């Protein structure tokens, strides 16, 4: 199925890679969430990078642009670099047919954390980095502001014993969580139907804390 996209004007084809069911569901959720961002960017403009080793590119582009030139100083991140560099050679196609999927082994804790460290180290060399990070920042900021505002109004209304406002704030908070859970379930189910629905709001709102933990690991890592 990937090869059917190998025609003009496409110069790059990105596919999906699933992970073994033994992988922690929160990690499968994180991979799917990142995949949506990266594939959407590839479809709408230029590919930024990929978090999955399922890529087809033109040999002629690879030879003309001197292969991995520009990424030789990094130990990992070759797929990120390939997509970032060769997406500019022409259009990027996305193939999501299940017959084109690959499957990878469940990463160990060490491999999972190292992958995040390698990305943080190499991200500064990727083009179009700012626009992607800005998009993800506001996508995280807005729902968290809504959550904080709903909780704040709920607490204040309880303190003031304004029960009508308490009911409205409680309903707004519940509606926010339910809607985001439904949206997350529909998105995740396209690639992984085994992630428990009741865990999705915790995974969703826990993203910023997992990202912060990754930042701390990077700050503490030996970069020599």
Regions from the PLM with identified roles:
Residues 1, 108, 142-143:
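Residues at alpha-helix caps and immediate loop-helix transition turns in enzyme cores, especially N-
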Residues 2-69, 120, 200, 204-207, ...:
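Long helical/loop segments within the catalytic core of UDP-sugar-dependent glycosyltransferases
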Residues 6, 12-34, 69-135:
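Catalytic donor/gating beta->alpha subdomain of glycosyltransferases that bind UDP-sugars
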Residues 51-52, 222-224:
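Short alpha-helical "patches" and their helix-cap loops
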Residues 135-143:
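Select subsegments of transmembrane alpha-helices in polytopic membrane proteins
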Residues 142-222:
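Membrane-embedded multi-pass helical conduit in multi-pass membrane proteins
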């Amino acid at each position: 199925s990937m090869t059917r996209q190998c025609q003009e004007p496409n110069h790059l084809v990105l596919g999906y890679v699933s992970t073994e069911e033994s992988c922690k569901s929160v990690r499968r959720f994180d991979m799917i969430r990142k995949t949506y961002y990266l594939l959407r960017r590839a479809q709408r403009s230029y590919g930024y990078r990929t978090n999955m080793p399922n890529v087809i590119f033109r040999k002629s582009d690879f030879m003309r642009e001197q292969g991995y030139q520009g990424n030789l100083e990094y130990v990992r991140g070759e797929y990120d670099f390939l997509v970032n560099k060769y997406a500019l050679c022409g259009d990027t196609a996305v193939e999501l047919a299940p017959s084109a999927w690959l499957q990878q082994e469940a990463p160990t804790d060490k491999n999972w954390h190292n992958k995040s460290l390698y990305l943080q180290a190499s991200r500064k060399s990727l083009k179009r980095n700012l626009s992607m990070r800005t998009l993800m920042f506001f996508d995280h900021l807005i729902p968290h502001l809504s959550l904080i505002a709903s909780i704040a109004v709920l607490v204040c209304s309880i303190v003031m014993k304004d029960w009508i406002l308490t009911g409205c704030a409680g309903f707004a908070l519940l509606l926010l969580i339910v809607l985001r859970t439904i949206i997350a379930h529909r998105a995740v189910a396209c690639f992984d139907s085994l992630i428990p629905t009741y865990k999705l709001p915790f995974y969703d709102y826990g993203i910023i804390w997992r990202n912060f933990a990754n930042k701390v690991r990077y700050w503490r890592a030996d970069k020599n």
